[in-house]
């Protein structure tokens, strides 16, 4: 332990001697300004330090002494970095035209102005700069819009109702125009009676009539000729009503009508002739 203390004392003495020697050298250089010592590092752009002082009136540090060093005294030469003599240039403004489509406040109104009188039915509303809402708006235009909320917030998946109540939803009420094709048509007059549950038979009858008419339109003249040829065969067993319905189904030229009339006579005769003949002839027994 004693050896360590002796070493510490020796180091302190050496440090004190070094500082003492350095102070003496600085004093000698100040006394003899002619002789200068060249240092290895060049100190460029550093002002000469004349004195150092402490600032004791600093409220930020509770008036503790704050070291402050003054730089080299004298006027510093700097370039003119701010132009004092030049005047500011006028700001460019775009040309203003009172006859533009956006501004019509300086133009004369097309209709004569009338002072607005409250609850006056005889006078017309005044035509000014501010657009006035015309009271005679039709109800059809108002019904062409649907009102809804623009955006909905406060969605919480952890709660049992995920979305908030209707009255507590955040957003603005916006109107959306209804397209003419998207609106459902309301039945009028007889359509209301036909749409009732008791009018199913009438609907079915209309559907069958429409189906029959569509089928009759779709029949081609080639099919009509095939039907007439089938009727001319002697082995067909058709009645007069069936033949007449087939003739009505395929209207054609008067020549074809004559042919069909002759075919009906032959088919009727064949049908009467076949009625007397038995359908199944008796089988002869071999003796």
Swiss-Prot record:
Keyword Disulfide bond among record annotations: no
Disordered: annotated span: 1-42, 179-287
Major localization listed first in the record, in broad terms: other
GO CC terms in record: cilium
Compositional bias segments (type: Basic and acidic residues): 1-15, 25-34, 203-212, 232-245
Stored InterPro entries: CMIP6
Keyword Protease listed: no
Top-level lineage group: Eukaryota
Protein name: Ciliary microtubule inner protein 6
Originating organism: Homo sapiens (Human)
Lineage start: Eukaryota, Metazoa, Chordata, Craniata, Vertebrata
Gene behind this protein: CIMIP6
């Amino acid at each position: 332990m004693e050896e360590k203390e002796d070493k510490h004392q020796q180091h302190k003495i050496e440090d004190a001697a070094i500082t003492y020697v350095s102070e003496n050298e600085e004093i000698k250089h100040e006394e003899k300004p002619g002789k200068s010592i060249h240092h290895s590092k060049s100190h460029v752009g550093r002002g000469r330090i004349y004195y150092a002082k402490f600032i004791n009136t600093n409220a930020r540090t509770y008036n503790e002494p704050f070291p402050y060093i003054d730089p080299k005294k004298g006027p510093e030469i700097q370039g003119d970095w701010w132009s004092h003599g030049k005047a500011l240039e006028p700001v460019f403004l775009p040309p203003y035209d009172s006859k533009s489509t956006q501004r019509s406040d300086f133009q004369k109104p097309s209709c004569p102005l009338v002072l607005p009188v409250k609850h006056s039915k005889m006078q017309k509303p005044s035509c000014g700069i501010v657009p006035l809402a015309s009271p005679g708006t039709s109800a059809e235009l108002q019904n062409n819009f649907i009102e809804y909320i623009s955006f909905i917030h406060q969605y919480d998946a952890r709660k049992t109702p995920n979305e908030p109540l209707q009255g507590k939803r955040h957003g603005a009420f916006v109107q959306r125009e209804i397209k003419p094709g998207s609106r459902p048509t309301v039945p009028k007059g007889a359509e209301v009676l036909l749409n009732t549950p008791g009018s199913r038979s009438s609907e079915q009858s209309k559907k069958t009539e429409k189906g029959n008419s569509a089928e009759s339109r779709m029949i081609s003249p080639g099919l009509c000729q095939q039907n007439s040829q089938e009727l001319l065969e002697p082995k067909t067993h058709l009645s007069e009503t069936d033949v007449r319905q087939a003739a009505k189904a395929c209207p054609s030229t008067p020549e074809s009508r004559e042919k069909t009339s002759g075919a009906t006579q032959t088919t009727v005769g064949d049908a009467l002739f076949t009625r007397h003949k038995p359908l199944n002839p008796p089988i002869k027994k071999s003796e």
